């Protein structure tokens, strides 16, 4: 994006942020659709700006992720209002992420290589997170949602949408996100498989450069002894570490 246009976009965004931020603590049926749209556009704004060193969407190497706070704020807006009552036909394209029925994912079999990769991920979790491990519930839940997103995304790859992909990040637990932020290797591996789904959105210009940026950050945070588990996600994203 040309520098002049980028400066103008930032001015408009900062003005909108000043107007909308005070309302986020006072969500009502009359403003929730507008606030939901604002939060959605704000998340897209971060993507459009492009990746910054050390910022990995759901965790930053230099502090908390402001993008994640905004993205998860979408859930808070949904919970504060009954979207079924306030949603108008013209606002249907911004239906809440929680409305996407992952449980109704088609039963169509995945490509054998993808299925094998997901099974390898499940094995990694079983080996590294035992049944009495306090991390297990959040990890298994994240894996379950991820499988459903993969099924939807790979069933009609030409029609994969950001709603399908980011519904995973919308549904994972706060505990799982804390584990990612603590650079837990199992949580990082799950995140790397999510990055593969983001790769499928690269037809949208604002997603360009994000998959390789995220994968390189995950690789840097992964313990040396477990980096080989990232082989499949790295291959799918098209990123390899420098020699």
Model regions: which residues?
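A short secondary-structure junction signal
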Residues: 49-51, 85-90
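C-terminal effector modules of eukaryotic transcription factors
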Residues: 63-82, 89-243
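Short helix/strand-bridging catalytic loops that position acidic/His residues to coordinate divalent metals
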Residues: 4, 54-63
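General structural concept
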Residues: 18-19
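Amphipathic alpha-helical regulatory regions
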Residues: 1-6, 11-15, 29-51, 69-74, ...
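Flexible helix-coil transition and linker loops at the boundaries of alpha-helical arrays
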Residues: 22-30
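Short, solvent-exposed coil/turn linker segments
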Residues: 52-55, 173
């Amino acid at each position: 994006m040309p520098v002049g246009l980028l400066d103008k976009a930032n001015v408009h965004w900062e003005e909108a942020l000043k107007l909308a931020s005070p309302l986020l603590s006072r969500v009502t049926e009359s403003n929730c659709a507008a606030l939901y749209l604002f939060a959605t556009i704000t998340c897209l704004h971060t993507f459009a700006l492009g990746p910054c060193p050390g910022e990995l969407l759901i965790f930053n190497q230099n502090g908390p992720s402001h993008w994640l706070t905004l993205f998860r704020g979408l859930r808070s807006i949904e919970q504060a209002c009954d979207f079924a009552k306030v949603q108008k036909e013209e606002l249907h394209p911004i239906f809440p992420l929680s409305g996407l029925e992952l449980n109704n994912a088609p039963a169509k079999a995945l490509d054998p290589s993808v299925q094998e990769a997901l099974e390898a991920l499940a094995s990694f979790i079983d080996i590294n997170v035992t049944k009495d491990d306090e991390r297990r519930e959040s990890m298994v839940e994240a894996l379950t949602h991820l499988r459903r997103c993969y099924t939807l995304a790979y069933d009609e790859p030409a029609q994969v949408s950001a709603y399908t992909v980011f519904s995973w990040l919308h549904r994972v637990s706060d505990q799982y996100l804390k584990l990612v932020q603590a650079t837990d290797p199992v949580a990082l591996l799950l995140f790397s498989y999510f990055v593969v789904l983001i790769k499928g959105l690269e037809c949208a210009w604002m997603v360009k450069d994000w998959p390789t940026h995220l994968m390189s950050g995950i690789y840097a945070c992964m313990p040396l002894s477990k980096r080989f588990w990232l082989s499949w996600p790295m291959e799918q994203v098209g990123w390899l570490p420098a020699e």
